[in-house]
Amino acid sequence: MNNSQQWQAANTARAALYRWFAELFARELTKTNLTQLQAQYPSLHAAFSDLNLEPQSAALQTALENLQVIPAPDRALELAADFAHLFLLSGHQSAPPYASYYLESDQMLYGKPAQQMSEFLASHKLDLHPEFREPKDHLSIYLQVMSLWIKSSVDEQANLIEMAVQQQHFLEDALLSWLPKFAARCQHIRVKTQVYPAIIDLLLHFVQEDRQALEDMAEAE
């Protein structure tokens, strides 16, 4: 199997992982969602370990296991409180998951990054979930975009090298331009559990690894 065939095979997993992250940041985990996450995480941990993310994934696995000290009926509630404290409070108290907050000097939402994402979605004919009504520069939308973009490139059998270059530039310019600042801010906010801090750290390293893989893919041809 040559490099192009290997990368094509990897794209299905890439799309699934970006979608998984997007869903985690879109809304709070319900009790059912949390049960599913805990049940499926051993297989996800194996996948992340294969991507050189074993330390970051192990931290999330430990954080999920440590939820056992919280009474079962309260676990999802505690995580919902962490979600709200991290992402939903006013900017000086939380880490808003919007690019504009980190890239615009006035830290106002609906800034230039939101406009750029709206234009990107229109030009690439990517349809997001209609019930997700956050500003277009919400972190979950960037992750949804990557998932849909990867899937469409597989379905349409797009030129893999050209697509790798485009996706590399998207990650560099649209996401990694502010994701490290967001991740660092999250780590300084006190929360009850370490689940979301671990998810955020895993996401940052995943995106960085994916960007590097895209660069390596383009340079190998």
Curated annotation (Swiss-Prot):
Protease in keyword set: no
Localization, UniProt: Cytoplasm
One family name in Pfam for this protein: Nitrate_red_del
Primary residence: cytoplasm
Any one GO BP annotation for this protein: protein complex oligomerization
GO cellular component terms listed in the entry, alphabetical order: cytoplasm
InterPro entries, sorted: Chaperone_TorD, DMSO/NO3_reduct_chaperone, HscB_C_sf, TorD-like_sf, TorD/DmsD_chaperones
Keywords: Chaperone, Cytoplasm
Record family assignment: Belongs to the TorD/DmsD family. TorD subfamily.
Function field: Involved in the biogenesis of TorA. Acts on TorA before the insertion of the molybdenum cofactor and, as a result, probably favors a conformation of the apoenzyme that is competent for acquiring the cofactor.
The name this protein goes by in its record: Chaperone protein TorD
Species in which this protein is naturally found: Psychrobacter sp. (strain PRwf-1)
Lineage: Bacteria, Pseudomonadati, Pseudomonadota, Gammaproteobacteria, Moraxellales
Gene: torD
